[in-house]
């Protein structure tokens, strides 16, 4: 997948400009190698939809999603309202914000899982370890139900 710096192939990373960009132009940028996602078509649409919500609801400033949240429940609701954010992504982003970026809202620490999550991953090595652990857990679950 492409990194944010590689997405600069557009020449900008501004939510308003991305939201307003012709979808075909944005899709072409998302498909350039390395692609943004293994499904660049659906991800291009999701990114543009997300940018449109950030512009409409947060003035184009994504950090307002968490800086203006009043507590953990409000943060979860704000994240869950974003296009493409299901329950798992909401939990992951909340862990990331709390553990890696120091966001500290009432009730947030109590929502943190005791086990490692994707939101705890900081390096490629940690990602490989995390993914191996997930694969092993899935294999054990399949074996137990067989």
Annotate the PLM regions.
Residues 72-81, 87-146:
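C-terminal accessory module of base-excision DNA glycosylases/AP lyases that mediates lesion recognition
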Residues 1, 19, 40, 87-90:
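Alpha-helix N-cap/helix-initiation sites
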Residues 1-11, 16:
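A positional/architectural concept
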Residues 1, 54-60, 101-105:
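Short helix-capping/linker segments at secondary-structure and domain boundaries
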Residues 12-81:
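Alpha-helical ds-nucleic-acid-binding substructure associated with the helix-hairpin-helix region
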Residues 2, 45-49, 92, 96:
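Amphipathic alpha-helical interaction segments
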């Amino acid at each position: 997948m492409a990194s944010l710096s590689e997405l600069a192939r557009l020449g900008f990373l501004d939510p308003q400009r991305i939201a307003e960009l012709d979808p075909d132009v944005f899709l072409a940028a998302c498909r350039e190698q390395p692609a943004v996602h293994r499904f660049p078509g659906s991800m291009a649409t999701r990114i543009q939809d997300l940018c449109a919500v950030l512009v409409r609801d947060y003035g184009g400033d994504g950090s307002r999603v968490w800086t203006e949240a009043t507590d953990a429940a409000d943060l979860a609701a704000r994240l869950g309202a974003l296009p493409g954010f299901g329950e798992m992504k909401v939990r992951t982003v909340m862990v990331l914000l709390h553990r890696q970026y120091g966001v500290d809202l009432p009730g947030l620490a109590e929502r943190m899982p005791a086990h490692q999550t994707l939101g705890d991953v900081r390096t490629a090595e940690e990602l490989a370890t995390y993914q191996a652990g997930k694969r092993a857990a899935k294999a054990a679950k399949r074996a137990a139900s067989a």
